[in-house]
Amino acid sequence: MRYIKSMTQQKLSFLLALYIGLFMNCAVFYRRFGSYAQEFTIWKGLSAVVELGATVLVTFFLLRLLSLFGRRVWRVLATLVVLFSAGASYYMTFLNVVIGYGIIASVMTTDIDLSKEVVGLHFVLWLIAVSVLPLIFIWSNHCRYTLLRQLRTPGQRFRSAAVVVLAGVMVWAPIRLLDIQQKKVERATGIDLPSYGGVVANSYLPSNWLSALGLYAWAQVDESSDNNSLINPARKFTYVAPKDGDDTYVVFIIGETTRWDHMGIFGYERNTTPKLAQEKNLAAFRGYSCDTATKLSLRCMFVREGGADNNPQRTLKEQNVFAVLKQLGFSSDLYAMQSEMWFYSNTMADNISYREQIGAEPRNRGKTVDDMLLIDEMQNSLAQNPEGKHLIILHTKGSHFNYTQRYPRSYAQWKPECIGVDSGCTKAQMINSYDNSVTYVDHFITSVFDQLRDKKAIVFYAADHGESINEREHLHGTPRNMAPPEQFRVPMLVWMSDKYLASPQHAQMFAHLKQQAEIKVPRRHVELYDTIMGCLGYTSPNGGINQNNNWCHIPDVQKVAAK
């Protein structure tokens, strides 16, 4: 006991790091390394060693940094690190839970009764048993030589700072090396995998809950800032809800780089959309994006027309339609194969999971990270919201370059393909790979429909921008005032389930949509806000919905004819 009391704060931090990093993560080690052992390679063995070391060193790095606040504050913060890590380890060990944004958001909910429901006697016993030893160490130790004190003491500054910096470098450098190695494997095989460092950070304590907590805090600050700075249509306008909307499911699929002129349903010579072509409840429009890059389009495609400035950076002025639906009583989940966190937080979604978190899920370890992983997330979301009035946002990777990485080998029907980034592909090879990716998009979209056929549901799809695939220009992102037309060509789809169409009003809306699609009426991103609200049956007596932009608005002449 005397040794524990007299131990330096640096030694105590390392001892705690061993306990948290190794003991509390042992269930994760077992699951991750168990799969490594089945097909062992030198790189997998090296990965195991790196991950073991990283969990210890990152915890040591954290605890030493926290001692910059002084001895008393360090004890409190270290106690919280131990307790939070012990609590998280219970769910990771016994329930195989991946601690991410959604878990943290659920824990931080203001509904304390709901949070209590997941805390039982076994959890309390585990928390006490796992935490008691490190807490005794923390509160018995004199905490001599905190980093704050050492930095203030001549002769100790360089050495103490060097140890902390070295720990950080020893975490970052090996993981970075393995990340580079994984990228080489991806380029050689055409298989797309999540960031190695991102998966590691989302898999182990304490980095998983710390990163999720940081993301949650940032989202709250960002949301609060946006609430104060952005115009809120839900407050500015009056929205009248439809009488039969409380059991409705809404899904919005955000596509990536897919062009309508490479889709069979729009007359393209190749049958790239065989499944969508069979959908009787689908209205498909030739659309035009508001910009040519993902980040810019996400700013302007979900707000009211004029809700984003027309400047190069597309400065936001208003909240988006998803935030408005949330304020109108919808629950919402967002699942993404990308990492546009600024946008995700602006949706006010109850739960957000992005590609690294999804890739870290036990059921997804070792799998290619493609859009179909979102289907499992969607199924869970539907199961957890059986009553409806629920919004699901799916942000896909769609047809983004490298096109060949966007689909499995079974979808490689047009060859030769563009295999690698540096392989100097011909235009024909790039088009073959691009068209294969569009066929996989077709499969993904109809898989979303399959989850909703027995529900009262409406699905919207719109790609964020188009793509250039020719000898002179490639990819996208050209400034919109000089971008070629193909970078603006995006498919925009509306699908309604049979139960949704059982309503005469909805059936009339859909008939109007089909009529407009058949005569090839062009549609725009900036019409999505009014269309989503209008197709759900919302009305606004004071201008909250621009009927000129509402695809589901039936002109008075047609209403009279219908009667």
Swiss-Prot record:
One of its GO terms (cellular component) is plasma membrane. Residues 31-48, 101-117, 181-563 are periplasmic. Its main location: membrane. It is an enzyme of class 2 (transferase). The chain crosses the membrane at residues 10-30, 49-69, 80-100, 118-138, 160-180. Residues 1-9, 70-79, 139-159 are cytoplasmic. Catalyzes the addition of a phosphoethanolamine (pEtN) moiety to the outer 3-deoxy-D-manno-octulosonic acid (Kdo) residue of a Kdo(2)-lipid A. Phosphatidylethanolamines with one unsaturated acyl group function as pEtN donors and the reaction releases diacylglycerol. Disulfide bonds: none annotated. The keyword Lipid biosynthesis applies. GO terms for molecular function: phosphatidylethanolamine:Kdo2-lipid A phosphoethanolamine transferase activity. The keyword Transport does not apply. GO terms for biological process: lipid A biosynthetic process; lipopolysaccharide core region biosynthetic process. Keywords: Cell inner membrane, Cell membrane, Lipid A biosynthesis, Lipid biosynthesis, Lipid metabolism, Lipopolysaccharide biosynthesis, Membrane, Transferase, Transmembrane, Transmembrane helix. It is a multi-pass membrane protein. Its cofactor is Ca(2+). Its EC number is 2.7.8.42. The gene is eptB. It catalyses: alpha-Kdo-(2->4)-alpha-Kdo-(2->6)-lipid A (E. coli) + a 1,2-diacyl-sn-glycero-3-phosphoethanolamine = 7-O-[2-aminoethoxy(hydroxy)phosphoryl]-alpha-Kdo-(2->4)-alpha-Kdo-(2->6)-lipid A + a 1,2-diacyl-sn-glycerol; alpha-Kdo-(2->4)-alpha-Kdo-(2->6)-lipid IVA (E. coli) + a 1,2-diacyl-sn-glycero-3-phosphoethanolamine = 7-O-[2-aminoethoxy(hydroxy)phosphoryl]-alpha-Kdo-(2->4)-alpha-Kdo-(2->6)-lipid IVA (E. coli) + a 1,2-diacyl-sn-glycerol. This is Kdo(2)-lipid A phosphoethanolamine 7''-transferase. It is found in: Cell inner membrane. NCBIfam families: PRK11560.1. Belongs to the phosphoethanolamine transferase family. EptB subfamily. It comes from Salmonella typhimurium (strain LT2 / SGSC1412 / ATCC 700720).
